[in-house]
Amino acid sequence: MIAELGNYALALSLAVSLMLAIFPLWGAEKGNAQLMALARPMTYGLFASLSIAFAVLFYLFAVNDFSVQYVVNNSNTALPIYYRLSAVWGSHEGSLLLWIWLLAVWSSAVALLSKHLPQEAVARVLGIMGIISVGFVLFVLFTSNPFTRTFPDFPVDGKELNPMLQDVGLIFHPPLLYMGYVGFSVAFAFAIASLMTGKLDSAWARWSRPWTLAAWVFLTLGIVLGSWWAYYELGWGGWWFWDPVENSSFMPWLAGTALIHSLSVTEKRGSFKAWTVLLAILAFSLCLLGTFLVRSGILVSVHAFASDPTRGLYILAYLVVVIGGSLALYAYKGSQIRSRDNAERYSRESMLLLNNILLMTALCVVFLGTLLPLVHKQLGLGSISIGAPFFDQMFLIIMTPFALLLGIGPLVKWRRDQFSAIRTPVVISVFVMLIAGFALPYFLQDKITVSSVLGSMMTVIIALLALYELQQRATHRESFFVGVRKLSRSHWGMMLAHLGVAMTVWGIAFSQNFSVERDVRMKVGDSAQIGRYDFKFAGVTDANGPNYIGGKAQIDISKDGQPEASLFAEKRFYTVSRMSMTEAAITGGLTRDLYVALGEKLEDNSWALRLYYKPFIRWIWIGGLFMALGGLLCMFDRRYRFNALLKK
C-alpha cells in the first residue's frame, strides 16, 4: 500500500503541475489577479506532493520492500543503510524523481523569496517552471515509475546498488549536480517571462543574478566532487576523462559562467540584453541535453543509465519542444530588445564581451568534440574518436588569453577607460609572469615543458593582477586596512573565484606534466622507487565488509630514508553483483599526492600495484572550492538582499 501512496502522490503532482502551468500564465496574460495569486499555493502544493513521493521511496529502501522493482534492482539486505538510502537516486527512475523534486524545491524557493517582485512576474516565472515540471512528471509517471510492483512474485533479496556508487562522495555528488542543473531553470524562467512581456531591464538582471549564482555554485560543487570521486575511486589516478557525460555537465557550467558575467553588464550598464537572454536559454537547454545523453541509451559510460529507446525518444521530443519553443519565442521577440548603448573599445563591458566570446569558444569545442563522434556513429558512418589530447590542446589555446582577461578585466572601468591608467602594473606583472613561468617549473620539478610554462604564467598573471586590483580598490579613498574591510561581498567573491581559476590551472599544469606512474610487481619486502620516495610492500591481509570480501595491502613510504606514511590499498569483490573494485590509498598535501592502487594477485605470490606521484593535484579541487565560495559571496552581496530589492 505504501508504494501505491507514492503513485498517488505522483498523479497528484501531475495534476498540480498542470494547473500551475495554465492558470498563473493565463491570469498574467489577462491581468486576472486571482488567477495569478494561485501561483504560490500551487507551487507549495507541488512541492508537498513530490515530497510525499520522495519520502515514500526513501521508506521503501529503508525497509527493503522487494515487492517494488526499483528497490529490487538497487538494494540488498547486506547493503549498509546509508548506501541503501542513497540508492534512492542510484539509478534512472529514482534520479529522475530527485530531479523533479529539486525542481519543486527551486520553484518553492522562488515563490517564498520573491514576495517583493511584481505579481505578474512571479506568476509568469512559476508558470514556466510548472510547464517544465509537467514534462518531467509525465516522464516519471508513465515511462520511469520507481513505484512499479514486481507482483505477483517478488524475490527475497535484491540485486544490490552498483559497487561504483557505494561511496560517500556519490551520496552527495548527484544531488549537488542536479541542484545546479535544475537551478538554471530559474534563470531560464526569468528570461522567458521577460521575453513574453518585453520588459528586459536592469531590474530583471538583478532578480535573475542571485538565482543564477546559486545554480552555478551547486553545479561547481557537483563537478568538483565528481572529479574528486573519479580520482580516488576508479584507481588510475585520473580526475577528468572528457567522457561525454562529464562534458555534458561542463557545458552548462561554461554557459552559466558566461551568463553570470553577462548579467553583470546588463545589470550595471543595460547592455547585452538579448545576448544575456540567449545565454539563460542556452544554459538550461544544455542541462536538458545532458539529461538526454545520460538517459537515451546512446552512450556507453560509467555515468550513463541503462535505458530503453522509448525513454530516449521522449526526452528528445521534450528537448525539441522546450528548446525549440524557447528559441522561437526569442526569434520573435529578440529583435524588440534594445540595449542602452554599445560598449567602448576599451571598457569593462568590452573585457566582459571578450570573456564571453572565449567561454563560448570553449563551449563550442566541448560541444563539437562530444557530439560529433555520437552523430557520426548514429548516422552509420562508423566510429571516430576525439580524445583528451584534442580537448587539452584546445583549452590550452583558449585559456591563455582568458587568463590575461581575467587579470586585466577587473582593473578596467565601466563605459570608457584608457590603458595608460594601468600600463605600469600590467607591464610589471607581465615581466614577472615571464620569469616565473619558466622559473617555477624548473625550480619545483627540475623540468620545463610548454604547457607547464603557460600554466605557470596564467596562474601568476591572474594572482598578481587580482592582488593589485584589491590594493587599488581598498586604497581608493582610505588606508588599505580600513578600505579592505569596506569592500563588498561581491568584490571578494569575484577575487576568490578568479584566484580559484588560477589555483585550478596551476594544479592541472603541474599534475599533468610532472606526474610519475609506475606499474610494479611486488612480493612482501620488495621496494620500488619514485624520485625521493621509496614504496615498500608489507603484504596483504583480509579485509571483508558487510557485502564484500577482499584484501588490504600495506605499503610503507619513506622519503630520503625517513618514514613518510603507511598506505592501505584494497581490492574488493562484491559477492552479490560479482564485481571487483579497487579502493586506492592516498596520502596528500599541498605540494604532492602519493597514490597506490592494488591490482591482482599473480602466480608467484606477488601482487600487481600501481604507484603514482602527483604534484600539486589537490590545487585543482581547492581552486574549485574557491570558485564556489566566490560565487556564494557574490550571491549574498547586499544589493541582492530581498529587502534591498524591495526598497529599489
Residue locations for each model-derived region?
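Membrane-interface interhelical loops and short amphipathic "cap" helices
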Residues: 1-9, 32-36, 59-93, 145-174, ...
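Contiguous transmembrane helix-bundle modules in multi-pass membrane proteins
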Residues: 1-34, 50-52, 66, 244-254, ...
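Interfacial and helix-entry/exit segments of alpha-helical transmembrane bundles
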Residues: 39-48, 128-129, 203-225, 270-287, ...
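Transmembrane-helix bundle segments that line or gate the permeation/cavity pathway
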Residues: 50-73, 77-79, 86-111, 139-149, ...
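Extended, hydrophobic alpha-helical segments in both membrane/secreted and soluble proteins
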Residues: 175, 182-192, 204-262, 275, ...
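Soluble non-transmembrane domains of integral membrane proteins
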Residues: 518-610
